[in-house]
Amino acid sequence: MKSHPGIAVACSALVFFGAGVMSQAAVAAIALSPKQDASRIAEIMQRLRDVQRFNAVSVAPNGKAVAWTVTEKTPAEKGGNGATVAAADKGAKAAKTGPAADGGKPGELLQIAAADGARVRTVRILRSAKSCQYSNLRWSPDSRTLAFLSNCNHGSGSDKQFDIYEVAATGIAARRITHLRGLVNQLAWTPGGSQLSFLYVEGDVHPVSAVSATKALVGVIGETGVERQRIAVLPASGGELHEITPASIFVYEYDWASKGDRLAYIGAPPPGRDNWWIAKLYTQAPGGTPQVTLDPSSVDGALRGLQIAVPRWSPDGSRIAFIGGLMSDQGVTGGDVYLIPADGGKPADVTPGIAISPSWLTWTGDDALLVSSIAGGSTRLSTFVLHGNQAATAQPLFTVAAGVENGTFSSAVSLSARHDMLAFIDSTFDSPPEVYSALLKTNSSAEPVGVVEPPHAITRINERVQPMWGKSVSVQWQNEGFQVQGWLLFPPAFDPHKRYPLIVFVHGGPSSALRPAWPHVGYGPVPLAAMGYFVLMPNPRGSFGEGEIFTQAVRLNMGYGDLRDILAGVDKVEAEYPVDDSRLGLTGWSYGGFMSMFAPTQTQRFKAAVVGAGLSDWKSYYGENSIDEWMIPFFGASVYENPMAYAKSSAIDFIKNDRTPSLIVVGEFDGECPAPQSFEYWHALRAMGVPTSLVVYAGEGHGFEKPKDERDVLERALRWFGKYLATDSAVQTAEAH
């Protein structure tokens, strides 16, 4: 059994965190020649490509099977005749996969295994002409059938179109049951298993997401091409599709009542990309008239004007649990747990003052919830026992020093019907992705009350991949009455007698948290560490993980309190580790990009910055972006009502103070942090005589999708930091203490 490298199990002696295994070939490499630099970067990129990614996992309700998706190896990694291989590792319970079958573009495998990861079978889709992608793995209530989405039967020019397929739990041949023409997501079985439901945007497969590239802004803006996402149902065996929610409400997520007679969903008027921040909670009978159960814009109390997510019906259908709080990004959830009567009424906060951020939940009994929370920079799974509308009692089950997911929602796990087994995808800075499973102790009501078997890997697909960077440690510090946490990555082959440069990597959001994870191919903190830097990843005020007071402390104060937290973290690291304060770098993406623009106008400590999808002027940004509704909860009013609140946090208003050489990168069709924001900052730095470079990537959105662009950003960033943070030698000998 491969145990998770960073787990703390409640009421147990088992407490151990990342071991920091390093590659034997790892070397400190900052002041390298261009040829050596390019070689080192290529080596890092190849190591990241060596990893096969899990994108979804689902436990059968009876707890006897687990399904997952995993990326195929790239063509360069294939051997033999290229045939797909997927079989149980002889003499062990964990599964291994082989390379893709078609020798073309890497795709994914869909596999079904026994609960312990043994006896793996790879699902086949007949007449598939290319590599495939899979998502939304959903078991039928009787555990006999797995439904899922795939783009297998569409040509290479239409790989964004997904359809619904089904495969028997004991089989490998899947059957296509739909021929859809539009975006589909959040597949689910209706209670009883007679129908399938999903979110559907008819006639348009363009992702409705703030991070995706925007469409060309042509035609009547606000009217032409507005997507309408509705809940649709069809017979489980295939048949006619029916949309059961009105076109006037864009549905973001939903849940069925246990009897299948009502829906609860989060929705707002189209366009959906912009209006999630003002969404309401609705209930509705299938095909009936929607009823507003909760409108955060008008409710009294702490929830007023905030965001809501993850609605879940109680087993008896009398209440709906959800998460409410200050959230900057759809799909990145954190806040408090609330209960509200299904027919409406006053919502009750059952986790008031809790010093963690619940992120996902599900009912496990009439008065019990299983809640996955961001705790510091880790993930904690707990049972919350409810006491009416009073504060719930938390019973922690285990904490994982990483983020977890099952391919549906942030921090979600997949759970058996009796709540005694769960599975999730996990990785750390030290361990590549695998599927993990845990066995839970339940009481007579099937409510989890303890851990029988802590999380352990049931796959070993990436067991041979080792990091090329140093160990990671959690760092805590106090600042202005707040407890702040961050992660520190070490350079490879760390020598405590040398002094190293430090790069601060600021996460996006601000309502988010950086938790350990194996890096994707492309730009991020880990490749920086692999090149010989210390990398600090702080979770300053405004982040999830320390409770709602901490998260909301950034309101009307962006760039100030959070920057002071970050600088205090740098001081903490410098006091404990051999960091050269004269070689500090700063970087981040999205909100981290904003901080990388704003911080150099407030402090001269940073000698170089790499700005990803940044934001330089909140005033002009308000009229440029496609998601302006997100700002009012943070600034208290629109820019037209209170422009000074926006000017206060705008780098452009303080640009004469900026002396930091800055590389700026952005996507051409970024709707969340539009390219003009980067142009403004670049133009201003040039006017001030500050070294700068701006790169705009064709066709990219807020989150880059093209591998060549991801690589290019990383290469440019490493060269930029190498130029401004390097010295004549890779590291300096530390002064004697």
Predicted regions and their residues:
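Residue-level detector of Asp-centered blade-edge/turn motifs that repeat once per structural unit
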Residues: 61-62, 141-142, 191-192, 258-259, ...
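A flexible loop/linker signature enriched in serine peptidases of the S9 family
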Residues: 70-110, 127-134, 149-165, 179-185, ...
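Blade/loop signatures of beta-propeller domains
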Residues: 29-41, 107, 225-234
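Conserved beta-strand position repeated across blades of beta-propeller domains
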Residues: 58, 138, 188, 255, ...
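A short helix->beta-strand "capping" segment at the edge of beta-propeller domains
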Residues: 32-52, 241-243
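Hydrophobic beta-strand positions that form the internal "hydrophobic ladder"
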Residues: 66, 143-146, 193-196, 263, ...
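Serine-hydrolase catalytic core recognition
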Residues: 410-737
